[in-house]
Amino acid sequence: MRWRKYIDFDVIHLLVGAIVGMGLSSCQPEMPVISTITVEADGLTVPVNPDLYGLTIEEINHGIDGGLYAELIQNRSFEDGVPPLNCPYDAARNVLITPNGWTIPFMRGDSVPGWRRIVPNTQIYPDMKELVNDKNRRSLLVAVSTSGESGRGGVIAEGYRGIPIRKGERYDLSFFAKGANMVPRTIRVALEDSMANTVLSDVFQVAPLYEWKRYRHTFTATEDAPNAVLTITADTSAVFWLDVVSLFPEGTWKGRKNGLRPDLAALVDSLAPRFIRFPGGSFVEGYTAGTYPIWRETLGDISERKHFWNVWAYGTTNGMGYHEYLQMCEDMGAEPIYVINSGITSQSRRPRYED
């Protein structure tokens, strides 16, 4: 079978003309394009469901602990410095190494952020043996050696860059203490100025025995101070342990116990969110087992709540837990949207770790 061969010159002429035309047009200067956008704000064009307007609240950059949550004591249970399970500490780089090889900033195991000695005659040690309960993994051992010249000794809680107090306002203190001396030693607890030179409240005195006991007191501030501290001191040589040291302003949002800062909560409320999504995104993903919130571990007394080193490289108390979030949503008239971990950690932080 023979194929017929032919050339269609009309088609060739058409193609050549198109190519030449395109070349010529590309050589022409571009003409300015003038566009006009008209916005008609009067009247409803497309209805928008008002329930689509809401907020996401996440524990990041101390947005909760040290922010919205009204707790004034940083590292109240002395858990900062306890590495998560299967995450060894690299002392040379001050990082944790996760099971999948990702690193996250950390600190030395003997560090006690948020706390310091009041004078050199005091030694402080994180203790992993004397514990209030099985939920807490460390307490603070305080050893004071005093003399007529050295004066009192003890520890200072600095809060989050200072503890802001106002004259006449009340602050609720609670803490666990346990003594080690044959004869109970008196320890004094007070609010003082940042240098611990001037007392700014009444003084609370206790003499802890051999058993753990929770003590409670309500201070009344005698002066305004933006950066006060909480001091726990002894005038004689003494050895004692502390744990779950908490200080709350009595005036929380809506007067809730274990509640929110009224100024920040009022700002959130002023946005009138129809829903609140909590407790975050990457915070919920975590980076290994035990480094993301599980709702049932954020309930109950603050001494029973699980603490962990979060994905943003600081300690999380879970003091603002599932109940407190629901309470906040109720107080603000917002629908709660709780974010749960699916069992897979953040994909952006090396290969996934499945729990």
Predicted regions and their residues:
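Active-site loop/turn elements of alpha/beta-hydrolase fold enzymes
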Residues: N341-G343
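Prokaryotic Sec-type signal peptides and long signal-anchor helices
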Residues: H13-V16, V82
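Bacterial N-terminal signal peptides that target proteins for export
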Residues: R2-L14
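Extracellular and organelle-lumenal recognition/adhesion modules and their flexible linkers in secreted
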Residues: P29-M320, Q327-V339, R350-D355
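C-terminal motif of bacterial Sec signal peptides marking the signal peptidase cleavage site
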Residues: G23-S26
